[in-house]
Every structure is written in structure tokens, then in C-alpha cells.
Amino acid sequence: MLGGVGGRHMSTRRRGSSPLVRGGAGLTGYAGPGASGNSNDVAAIPPDMQRYAGRRRRAVTTSDHKSCALVQTRIKLGDIMLAAQEAAQRDPGYASQYRRRPRLAGLSFGDWTSFGGEVPGLVDMAPGRDQGGGAGGGGGGGKGTTSLFILSEDNCIRKHTRFIIEWPPFEYAVLLTIIANCVVLALEEHLPKQDKTILAQKLEATEIYFLGIFCVEASLKILALGFVLHRGSYLRNIWNIMDFFVVVTGFITAFSQGIELDMDLRTLRAIRVLRPLKLVSGIPSLQVVLKSIIKAMAPLLQIGLLVLFAIVIFAIIGLEFYSGTLHKTCYSIRDINVIVKEGEQASPCNTDNKSEAPFGAHVCDANISTCMDHWEGPNFGITSFDNIGFAMLTVFQCITMEGWTAILYWTNDALGSTYNWIYFIPLIVLGSFFMLNLVLGVLSGEFAKEREKVENRQSFLKLRRQQQLEHELYCYLNWICKAEEVILAEERTTEEEKKHILEGRKRAEAKKKKLGKSKSTDTEEEEGDDDQDDGELSSSTKEKGPCKQFWLAEKRFRYWIRKSVKSQKFYWFVIVLVFFNTVCVAVEHYGQPQWLTDFLYFAEFVFLALFMLEMFIKVYALGPRTYFDSSFNRFDCVVISGSIFEVIWSEVKSGSFGLSVLRALRLLRIFKVTKYWKSLRNLVISLLSSMRSIISLLFLLFLFILIFALLGMQLFGGQFNFDSGTPPTNFNTFPIALLTVFQILTGEDWNEVMYQGIESQGGHKKGMIYSLYFIVLVLFGNYTLLNVFLAIAVDNLANAQELSAAENEEEEEDKQKQAQEIEKEIQSLQNPKDGGAPKVEICPPNGKGGKQSSEEEKKQDEDDDTGPKPMLPYSSMFILSPTNPVRRAAHWVVNLRYFDFFIMVVISLSSIALAAEDPVWEDSPRNEVLNYFDYAFTGVFTVEMILKIIDLGIILHPGSYLREFWNIMDAVVVICAAVSFAFDMTGSSAGQNLSTIKSLRVLRVLRPLKTIKRVPKLKAVFDCVVNSLKNVINILIVYILFQFIFAVIAVQLFNGKFFYCSDESKYTQQDCQGQYFVFEDGALLPEPKKREWQSQFFHYDNVMAAMLTLFAVQTGEGWPQILQNSMAATYEDKGPIQNFRIEMSIFYIVYFIVFPFFFVNIFVALIIITFQEQGEAELQDGEIDKNQKSCIDFTIQARPLERYMPKERNSVKYKIWRIVVSTPFEYFIMGLIVLNTVLLMMKFHRQSDAYKNTLKYMNMCFTGMFTVECILKIAAFGVRNFFKDAWNTFDFITVIGSIVDALVIEFGENFINVGFLRLFRAARLIKLLRQGYTIRILLWTFVQSFKALPYVCLLIAMLFFIYAIIGMQVFGNIALDADTSITKHNNFQSFIQGLMLLFRCATGEAWPNIMLSCVKGRPCDAKAGKQEGGCGSNIAYAYFVSFIFFCSFLMLNLFVAVIMDNFDYLTRDSSILGAHHLDEFVRIWAEYDPNATGKIHYTEMYDMLKNMDPPLGFGNKCPNRLAYKKLIRMNMPVDVDLKVNFTTTLFALIRENLNIKVRRASERNQANEELRDTIRSIWPLQAKKMLDLLIPRNEEIGRGKMTVGKIYVCLLILESWRTTRFGQIESAGQPIMELQDVVVSDSRAGSLESLTHTGKRLHPPVQPVRHPSRSPSLRHSPGRPGYDHHGHYYHEGPGFSDTVSNVVEIQRHTHHPHPSQYNHRHRMRGPWSASTSPARTPSPIHHIDRGRHYGTTSLEQRSRSPSPIGGRQPPHTHQHYHRHHPHQHSYPVLVTRRGRGRRLPPTPNKPSTLQLKPANINFPKLNASPTHGSHIHVPIPAGMQHPPPGQHLPPMQPSHCPLSFEQAVAMGRGGRLLPSPVPNGYKPQPQAKQRTPRHSDSDEDDWC
């Protein structure tokens, strides 16, 4: 069937496709003249069938083009298309030929190629292709691909090798070999000094076998595929290149035993581990992850450049300030080679004389040591700023937030602590919080896009397959029906059959519904079909007669049990059981009494029995099948089986290890709660749904770690041998290497490992190259792969929220439906015959009715905040009525304008007072004074509270004082302060209990929070944070639950095993008695110390301790130490043995994946999503989205830029200006900056004097050059204009700073310390930033996100303030000790120090250690005057944990949220207009309006929009019709001078592009009003001034007012009129080539309208001369009324005039350049003059000056010639006024003359096959460039008549030599635009050239 097509092509037919099928040439079945096929067969198909065959062919061939990749490689489709078209033109009959070939009728392209030689015609058609290409069907380039020049395609060896390498078992064998090779590499243990274990020696012997196998594989592939020369050969595949490389290096290592190689080349074999990735490409979810990472690479590179730039700038600043400062340290006076340490490490010093040292610097104790410059520096000398390499590494390390505080403290020691924070804090904020979070934004955007793409693609493929099948089925059915109709016309389907069909359909529908409704979660028991089961039961009962009664009873009993099992009571009973079980597990702890142990032991059995019972009951009630349908039940069953197994096992073999973990899994049963808790359920579902992506990501991560671990083993194995022993993080064995890589991946202490790695390879002199290994690991692992976790989390959470929203909507709908049904029933009951009963509305029509009204009430309450509030109508405190004078006075005071302001001032003053207190010495004079201030402040707040209570009442009625949260807080603070003062005053014994008072006084800290209520925007951010906390509660529950589960497991595993003896040689508490000797460095005798049996600070002895420890691990701080302790843990009450149980690390790895990688990211994701939703929620009322808001924001703030240009053309100033703004000058300066940067980077520590002087003089040269640049610019622009541009001001400051700096260096630095001037050297680099377009946009967005941040920052500042004050009050008096974390650098002894400490904690630097240094029992500071060990407090735990929680989870995530919000355009569809595009508009506008008048002529506006690339402008490929239509919709008003306004144009453009309330013409006024309201509500302040500019009033665009819309409507009508009317007039049978078919210079191509709709168009013999305006202004038409001299127009018979008479006035105003302002040479220019001056050529020579002037300069012109001078000169009366010439109409006169036609030369823009027969033609606008003068059109005086239609008037010739037609056209084609320089340094984007031929405007949408 189907015309004889064989079955073997069915599959191909369904899949194959090609663009060709849709091609115009109709090639679908063409097989060339030689194709086989019997043409008589056609008769065998009935005509109907033929019709279907055609349709069938179309159905089959519209398929996805990707599936025919094979075809694309074998045949170039484009060639065939062209060949087919040529064939069609040569032989018109050919196209119909194929229809008679039934054999090929239904074949798509893919089928021909499967025939190979059967289609000779195909191959012949492709020109320039190998003729033998099709025959072999092979890869590459056809038959000619001989492998290695020897084996042809048909060679049997090659055929067999090809078969082998494509044989699946061969591929698997190779993969297995690779895995085996990796295992061998992993089994090696690396020993110091190249020693080898026996195993390693044996493994080395296997090396040669692997090499052999890989060599064989490579040879086979090379034989089969060829080596490199043709497509598809061996080395054309990236994997093969890698293999080949590995084999070659293998041979080099194998046969280079005698040669000493510096590096073991076996490292390179680790690269082969990448090969299993080939398998990966088949897994869709992995593809999403991989693709999104690869796709993100482009934007990531941009960000990478920005980060690199920041690193270079900071490194150069560091080089200038800190070079060589870290080499001084304290050396002992006794032995000058011994370093005197402070604490555990040596630290830099400044001097050993206290009087000389700056504040905060480290001074050596002069009695025992001296400060000398011999030290290599901290961290083996790697951490330093001695040269640019070290400086960049150090800066990069700071950006990763690891070890940055140590560097800060060292620089403080060396230089004093006054200024260093100014360098480090911006580095952290910009580098870490901003730059690196950008990576996250980009990745999550790409991930979401990629996932959506994959999902869409899958659904599309499904749908398409379904449609194809349906289509085929439909065709077949149609044929069958036809056949049936023909044969059995009288038979019809019987009623019974019909019934059958309908029933079938119903069943299918029911099934579909059921599938759709099934719950998306498996957490609940399947509600199995009761009736179905009963049916089965009854049938079995019937059969068994005798036991009938028993079965019936059993059935009833089972039914009852099933009911009970499904009831809520049973469910809650199980939940309570789970809860008790949880409690029992949680109370277990170290050192518990025996009775508790016994009780827990028996309780375990009881719970196990109960849970087993529950399971059996359920299985009985629901039946095994239904029971096991639910995945939760399956999980339950597994847990119970595990528990039974565990109980038996522990009886048999007690003390066994690790199985107890199974017990902990029972806690997962708590998730049963999700059955009734929707949002939690959806969260769990979304977590489960993201498992797929996460598992694939984990696989990727595992591969990554594996590769780097093997690489690390090869590089650093056996090398980490230091004086202090081998560190725990090393690369000696595979498991430890994996852990080390994993640790670096989490980012914790990666810098320490790097220092050890560099030191092991020869220290900072030789081993610096090895830092690359660690940097790549951090960049790719930590910043890229781990951020994909967050991307996945953000993505899936958004899904979960959508799920919840969708479910809520469904519920609402259901309720509504029910309500409506009830309503209907009631109506039908009530509805009497007369129908007069009233309607009853039970439920308001919109489902959210009730909710909305309450929300509106709330809103109204809130809105009243702005105005003065009316007094509440209730009596206050039952005493004061609303009319009471006291209450009225209080009300008046509280609502005074400045009352709130006054309170704000008092709050700020009291905050300052709090910060100024001295926390150490409580009775210091400063504190005494501040105390009195405090009384005053408290007094003010008390008075405020009393007044408010009098005004509002206390609590009983709505709106009273204590009904608001903020007031409650105020009251608490005031009362606490009052109570503490009372204690103070009385001095009673209670007052002695200082801690009570102190804690009461600490509450004063909350005062700053009062400001939140008073600053609306701050309150909005605060509400957002609170809301996101509400949202986070769900995840918090899941989070705490998981944390709890892990804590329970940890207690089971490590309970009581974290003890150790201070003498490391003892292992038990019994042995750890007495004393031991400690040898100190440099001490002669050992020192005896007492042995102590201690527990580690972080341990797992009970659940609470375990939770705290895990929280610390999860923040990623200090966890390697905890991991080492866990792996060393042996047995309860025994000491540690290093790496005793390495498998314990699995616990931490799993924990890390679940928590930091996943849960914490979900937190971040939730906050981000909430933040974004909040932002959008504000806009919902106005019905505009975020992007639209940011664009309107931009418009409101945008102002036109002023571009300066000297007036006198011949002045020196003008010449200087020309130089300064020229492109070469810009590039020269850029080059200087780059060279200067390189010069700055060349400095290094301990450089020779000659080198130093060379650098100094070169620096002076550069300073000189920049000074010259500055002077030139000031000369060119004038002082005022120069400083208008921010960049110039910046340049000027930089230059002045550099000059002063140079002078200081030259004439000695003694007279003033100007170190900061060195900053100016680095500042020049910043100028580089304004060059690149992408960087410019990135920076712009950066600034935007800073604008969005102030309130977020304020909130963070408040958080820091409050915590710093609490820290000062509670921990301020702890003694400083270099051995703990409370040191002179890091403490709470002043407010500033406290802030620094908190900032350090926020970046996560060793916060657990600080927390442990603040707990109870710490030594006190000497000034505090307290007993020893009485300082510190256990509040420290809550204090630090809460701070870290708020900081790292909430606050810093707000940064991330803001950044992701602002930078979403990086991954958004680039065709959507965003605020970041709008800068370009302001820039280009300035070129048309240099004086920043804010207005330009509407034709210039058209030009400008055509010159701007989409999405902002129209682009120069946009057909004019479409541009007109857009302008008509934009419809800006035009003023008297026909100019449009800047703001109005920009807003109209945005509105048109983003579709902001764009409606039909009839509804436009209403839409405008709505938009005005929206703008008033969102921008109340700006709306007053700007509203009429943004949205012009109806009066401005109504009747009698001129608008852009009206002008272009006329042009559009005119155009349509010409096409219809002219099209009917035949002119000698030859179409005339229209003006528009001539090529136009690219930039102005847009300014000529294309009028061709059909390919040929006819014109009347005479066409009026084209008007030379700047862009399409209105044209004259033949029937157009002329003008008389005074503006009265006369008619010439009915023409187009009736249609467009209302726009006649425009023509009179269309302007021309000012003739009077050019010298004679310019004035006499004819229409074709070769001058490139700004006037728009051609133009009539003589003009009349009407006194209007419009002086603008376009800076994007071809010309370098002068622009008009003297913008406001009085008009000259022109002497040529009365000499009119007959070609006043500005259209070219095209007259057809037979026999004298010439063909136009071929043109790139618009190839045209039409012929042109011109006489002398006046072509305007061939070389158009933006004008500088106003256009004035001279009307024809009344006496002049239009030329009669037949008569041809010779055009005016130019006064110099005439040009031939070809010359003119050539000149026009040469009119290319050269971008001219602009003063501001921006470069116009190069316009994309138009390549594709454009045949007509009908395909408008493809152009814009």
C-alpha cells in the first residue's frame, strides 16, 4: 500500500526530514532522469488515492530536522536546493515529473540517501561535489576517503576494523579497561623519596598491558577511520585526540627509563578518566546539567573578565602599599636565627621602639627580641605582595574568603591598623559578595532555561509523534472509508456498533480522568477501588458454598478494618507512636544511667512490635498489591525489615557497628505528616523531583573529584613531608586524596593545602606553578559545580510553589462550583412560575472575595499613614473621651510634622551613645557621662509612650497602642530601661545582682529598630525578610528534622568517643594520670605539665551537642578537624588513633551533600524567590512587571546628554577638538593605559636601584602623556564642558594625583606622607572599563544593583549594630590571649572591633573558634576588676549560631537575590528590551541633539531609530512599512517646528516594545488613563512633573494637533494608494525599476521605503521628483495640491488631495539645510556633487531662508567637514528667490523610452531581475548622511504649473561637471558610513550588514 513503498523504509520515513521538503522547488520525490520506476504504475492508483498520497507525503515529511543529522553530513542541503531551483528553471516540466513516480511519492529526503545508488540524479545535481560520493554511503567525503592513503572504503581489512570498532562489546571492553586503569592508579600508595610498596611494584608491571590495549584500540580506529585528513577521521574527534595523546605519552614514559624526567607523565593518564563521560551523554538529566554548564560558559567568561580585572586592580594597589612589608619579624637577641613567636605563629612586626610605631602595629619586646627584615614571610613566604604574581594569588585567596583575616591581621601588625580595613573590606564585599555571586546568577538562569528547553523538546517530540501517527491513521481510515463507500455503499454501521464505539470512548475518558487526578505524591495509602475488591470477593464467595457465612463475616471484618486504617484516628495514632519513638531515640546520651539504657532497650522492642502490627494490619486490610503500590509503604516495609535484621544481628554479635544507622532511618516516618500538610508535601515532592538532576550532578561531581584526586596523587603523592610531620590532608593514598579534594571543593582551608603543595614542590621560588591545580579546583569545583546545586534548587522550588498555587486554585474552583450548584438548586426550588423571586448570592462571584475585602481594609489602614490620622472614636483607657482636651493635645503632639523626626534624632543619638560605651571598665568616667545621657533618652521615650497611650488607648479597642508590634517593642524597651534605673537609684541588694540589670540594659539595643517603622522603604525590605522567613518555615521544619536525624545517627556512631589525653602517648582515662615533659622551642630544659583527660570542643555525646557540631560542619568552618577526630575515634572512653576508621568520612560526605550542598541552597533559593515575588507583588496593582518598571524608571530619570563642539571651523580649538574626539586618539590613550598597567605590574620587592629608577622615569613619562591628554581635552572642550562629563573629572583628579605623587617621589617623601597618592596610579585602569560594550552593560547593572541595595544594607547594618552592642556588653571584658581567638585584632573591646569581628564571622572565618573563646569561664581583662574565670557566657552559643544563621542564610542572600534580580538579563532572551539597553538611546540621541535641547526633528527621529539595533530601535533591515506601523502606534505629539520630545519618544518606544497597555485605537484613551494612574501610584513624586511628557494628554494628540502617528499614517496610505492605483497602469509591458531598487548605503538603507509588494510593479510614465528630506517625509503625488507663495494651496483636479488634505501643512514645514551658512563652495553644490559635507545630497540649489534654524550635529557622519556655525544667526534674504526651476517636485522623474534601457550593475542589497530604462534620473539620497541644518521646502508660486504628464523636464545639472548614470550609482554604492569619534569615548556598534536578498516587504516580520 501507499503506492508501493516498502516496509523497510517506514521508520526512516517517519523520522527523516529536511528543509528541502518545504523548499519551493518541489523536490520531494525527484529522482533524476535515470531513476527507476514504472510510469504506468500511476494508473493503478485511483485518483482519490493519488490525492491522499500527496497529503501523506506532506504529513510524513514535516518532521524535526535534527533527526536527519546523517543526511546533513552526506549531502549539503543548500547545494541541492540551488541545484533543484536551477533544474526547475531549465526544465519547467521537471517539477511535475516526480508526481508520476509512485515508487518515490511518499519518501522524504532521508529515504533517498538510504537508497544510495538508486538516485543518481540527486548526486548529479549537486554542483562541485565528488561524483562518487553517494555510492559508498560512507562518512567523510564519499568514495575518495582512503584510510592512510592505502585502504579504500571497500577494502576488507577496513570493513572489518570498522565493524569491530562499532561493535558494542568492543566499546564496553575499552570502557572497562579505562576503569581498571583508574583502579590501578588509585591502588598505589605514594611514599616519600620515590619508595614503592610491594603492591605498587606489582601494579607497575600491569602498565605495559594497559598501554598495549590502548595502542591496539587506537590502531584499529586509525585503520577504520583514517588518521586526520578527511572529515570523520580519527583525530577529528576530541576524545580520540585525548586517547592518542595518552598512548604517545605512555610510550615516552615506558621507553625513557634512562632519561630523568621532571614530572611523571603518568599523570596524563588520569585524563582518560574523563572518557566515561561518553556514556553520560545519553542521560537526559545529566545532559541538562552539562549543557547548562557549557551554555553558561559565555556569560561566565564575561564575569570572569570582570573578576580578573578587579583582582588586577586590587593586586596593583596591594603591590604599591604592601610590597615587602611582611618580611620583618621579631628575632631573639640571644640567638639571632630564632624567631620569637606571638602565640602559635610568627607574626610580622613594625619596629621594636613603641614610640615610633603607628597605632595597632606589632612592636617587638625590646628586652628579648629585635625587629629585623630577614623573614621569608607568613605561609612559607607565599602570602605576600612582593610581585604581581604573589599579589594576585593573595587577592584571589581573599576573594574566596579563606584566610583573609590572617592577612589583614599581618598587615595590621606590619603597618598599623588604621587604614588596612579600607583595602580588605571593599575587596571582600565587591569580590566575594558581588562578583562571585554573579556566577550563581548566570548558572541558575542557564539551568532553568536549559531544563525548560529539554522539557519542551520532549513534550514536542511526544506530541509530534502522536500527531504523525494520528495523521497516518486518519489517512488510512479515509482510504478504507472511501473503499467501503465505493464497494458497500448501502451498508451503514448498525446501532449496536455505534453503541460499542461510544462505550469504548467513555471508558477511555474515565481512564484519562483517573490518571490526571491521581495524587502526585506517594505518601498516602492508595485509595483502592473498594467496589472492585468487593466484586472479586463476592464472586469467590459464591463459588464456596459451605463456608459462605464465614467468608461473609471475614469480608465485613476486613471492610471495617480497612475503614479504620483509612481513618484519621489511626493515622494520628501512628504519628504519635513515631513521635514517642523519636523521643526515645533522642534521649540517648553519653554517661546515661543504667535504668534508662534498660528502658530504651525494651522500648525498642515494643515500638518494633507496634510498627510490625501496623504493617500487617495494613497489608490485610488493603491487600498486598494495593499496600505495595504506595512508595511510602514500601519504605516502611524496608525500615521494619531492617530493624528486625538489626535486632537479631545485635543479639548474635553485640557491639557491632554502623547498623544502628538503620534505626535512625525510622525517623523518616515523620514525613507521614505530609499527608495533610499541603505546602510541606509539595516541598517534599519538588525535592524528590529534583533528585534526578541532583544525582546526575553528583555523578558529575564524583567524576570531577576522582579525576582531581588521581591527578593530585600523581603530582603531590609522597611529597607532603614537613618538619612537623605529614599533615592530615595529603595525596599519599587514594581515599585520603579523595577527602583532600573534597575538602578543597567545600572551600574550607583550601589555601592551607595549597601552601603545603607549593612548599612540597620547592617552595615559593620553584613551586608556584602548582598553585594552578588548586585554583582550577576551586574555580570549577567550588564556584561552578556547587553553584549548579543552587541553580537546581531555585528551579525546583519555583516549581513547588507553582504546585501549591495550582492546588489552591483548584480547591477554590471546586468550592465555587459546589456553591454554584447549591445556588442553582436553591433557585430551582425558589423559582416560582412568575419568575419574580429574588436571586440569592451565597458566594461572591470572585473566589477571593472575602479575602480581598479584608486585605483592602488592611491596605486602607496602612495608606492612612501618610496623612494626619483622625482621632480614634473610642474613649482612651475608659477615661479620656475623643473630645477631652488632654487627649486632643496628646493627639496633636503625636501627629506634629516634626515629632517623628525628633524621635528619629533621639534614637540615633542614643544609638551613638550605646556604641561609645566602654565595655571593659564599667565605672570609667566616659560611662558615667553616657549614663546621664541615657536617663535623658529614656525620659524622651517614656514621654513618647505616655503620649501615644493617651492618644490611642492601651489595648482594648482596634488601633490602640499595644495592638501594634512596633509599639509593644517600644514599651518593653522603655519599661526595662526604667526598671534598671530604679535598681540603680535604690542601690538595693537586688541592684547588686549585676547580671539581671545588665541583661535588662542590653535590651536598649533594640532602640534602632524603631526606625524601621518610620522609613517606609526600609519597612518594605524588613517585611520582605519577615515574609521570606514565613516561607522558610516549611523548609526549616524539613531541615531541622534532617539535622535531627543526622544528629541521632552521629550520637549512635560517635557517642563518648571524642576524648583524648593531653599527653598523646596515653589512650585511656586510667593511664592519663600524673605529669609529662614538654620540650619548647629554644628552651634548654623540658617543662613538666599535668596530664588531663579532655573531650574535644565539638563532640557527639548527646543530641544537642551533636546538632551544634553539625551546624558548625554545615557552615563549612573547621569541619576538617572534626572529620579527623571522627576518623580517629576508636571506642567509648578510649583515645584517638589517626585514620582508625576512614569509612567514617562517608557520614560527612553524605551530610555535606544533603546539607551545605542542598538544603542550605534551598534556603538561599527560597529567599531569592520570595524576594523576587515581593518585588513583583508591589507591581501587581499597576499591572506592570519588573522589567517594565525598571525601563520606566530609567525613562523618568533619563535626561539628554550634551555633546560639545567648537563653533569656529578654522580655529585651533576646533582642530584640537577633532583630534581629541577621533578614534585613533581614543585607541592611543587606551594603549597608553594598558602599557601603564603593565608598567605598574613590573614592580617587585628587592628590585635593583637601576630597575627602580627606570620604572620611576617611565612612570613620569606616562604621567606626562596623561597630563598632555588632559590639557588638550580642556583646550578643546573648555573648562565648563570638560567637567560636565564624570569620566573627565575622574581623569583630571587622577592626573593631579599622579603629578603630586611624581613630585613627592622626586623631591623626597619627608615633608608629607602621601602614600594614598599611589592609588591614582591604579585608578587609571578603571578607564579601561568604559570600553567594552558587555563590560559597560555589566557595570551599569552593577551600579543598578547598588542602587537597589541601600535598604538591604541598612537592614544588615542594623543587624550588625545590634549584635555588636550585645557582644560588647556580654563579651567585652574577656582577656586578650594570642592562643585563643580573642586577640588584640579580634575582640569586643570597642564598637569598631566588635563590628570587625562580626564581619569576620559573616564571611565564615573560623567563627566556631571565636564562639568557643567566648563561653563561660574565660579569664577576665585586668581593667574589668572581676574574679578570675568569671567572664564569658553561655549565651555565646545562641549568640553566634543565631548571628551566623541570620547572616549567612538571610542577609547575604539578599545580596544574591538583588544580584540575580538585576542580572537576569545575562541569561534572558536577548531580544527582550531591558533597562540596560536604554543607555544606548541616550547616547545616540546626543548625536542628533548635541545641545541637549531634548528635541529633534521627526525625520531625524526616524533615522535614529533605523540606526539603532533591535530590541531598542528598528534596525536598518526593518522594512519601512513595519517601521511606519510601529511609529503610528507610538504616536508622539509633534511641536510647531515638527520636533519630537526626548522623554516622550523614549517612553513611547518602551511602551511599544514591551507592550505596556497597548490596545486598539478605540480603547487607546482608556489605556492611557489607566497607565497614567499606574505611574501616579508607583512614582507619586515624579509623576507630577513628568506625567504629561511620558503620556501626552489627549488634547495634545487629539483633533487638530499634529502627531507622528498622523504623519506616518499618511505616508502609509500614500504608499498603499500608489501600489493599488499605479499597479493598474501598464506601461509598454515593461516594469520600471523603482528608485528603491537601487542600492542605498547600508546605514541609510532604511530611509528609503520599499514599495514593492509583488515582485513587479508598474508605474505611470511620469513620477514626481523625490523630496530630499532626511527620511520619508510626506511626498508629493501627481494629484497633490501645490502651494502658493503665501501658504494658500490651489487644486489641480481631484487626486490624492482629498485623502490627505488634512496633512498638507506638513509639507510646507519640511526643512532644508541653511544655505546662508555655508561658504560659496558649499552653496553651489549640485544634486550630484561629490562633497561629503553634511548637507543631504541631492538638493535643489537655491533655497529661500524662512528664518527657521535647527542647528544640530550628528557625530556619526561620513564627513570630516565643518558643521554649521553660529546656531542663532539672523536669516539672510536670498538673492535667488525668484529664479525657480521646473523640477520643484522632489521625486525623480522616470520616463520610459523604448530601446534605450541600460541594466543596473549587480547590487548586494536588493538583487533585482527587473530592467530599468531610465533617461537622466535625479536619484536622491544615494549618499545620505545626517544633516546639520534645517530643511526648508520652497513651495511653487501660484504662477507655476505642474508639468503636463507626457512632458519630460531636464533636471538641473550641477554647476561643475556632469556625471554619467553609472558614476552616480557607483557613488551611491560607495556611501559607506565611517563611525566618527565622539567626545564621550563611546563607540557606535558596528551595524550588521544586510546579506540576504530581500524580494518584498510581505515578509516584514522576518526583518525587524
Swiss-Prot record:
Question: Where do the I repeat units fall?
Answer: 155-447
Q: Where is the composition biased (Basic and acidic residues)?
A: 1682-1691
The residues exposed to the Extracellular compartment are 188-205, 260-264, 323-419, 588-602, 650-658, 717-769, 915-930, 982-994, 1053-1141, 1251-1255, 1303-1309, 1368-1431
**BP GO annotations:** calcium ion import across plasma membrane; chemical synaptic transmission
Q: Which intervals carry biased composition (Gly residues)?
A: 23-35
Instruction: Give start-end positions of Polar residues composition bias.
Output: 1751-1762
Topology in the lipid bilayer is annotated as: Multi-pass membrane protein
Q: Where is the composition biased (Acidic residues)?
A: 523-536
Which Pfam family, an example, fits this chain? Ca_chan_IQ
Q: Which residues are glycosylated?
A: 353, 367, 993
Give the site residues for Calcium ion selectivity and permeability.
402, 748, 1117, 1405
Q: Where are the II repeats?
A: 554-797
> Which SUPFAM superfamilies is this protein grouped with?
Voltage-gated potassium channels
- Residue ranges of region Phenylalkylamine binding? 1430-1471
Q: Which family does it belong to?
A: Belongs to the calcium channel alpha-1 subunit (TC 1.A.1.11) family. CACNA1I subfamily.
Assembly and oligomerization:
Interacts with CATSPER1 and CATSPER2, leading to suppress T-type calcium channel activity.
Query: Could you identify this protein by its name?
Result: Voltage-dependent calcium channel type A subunit alpha-1
> What organism does the UniProt record list as the source?
Apis mellifera (Honeybee)
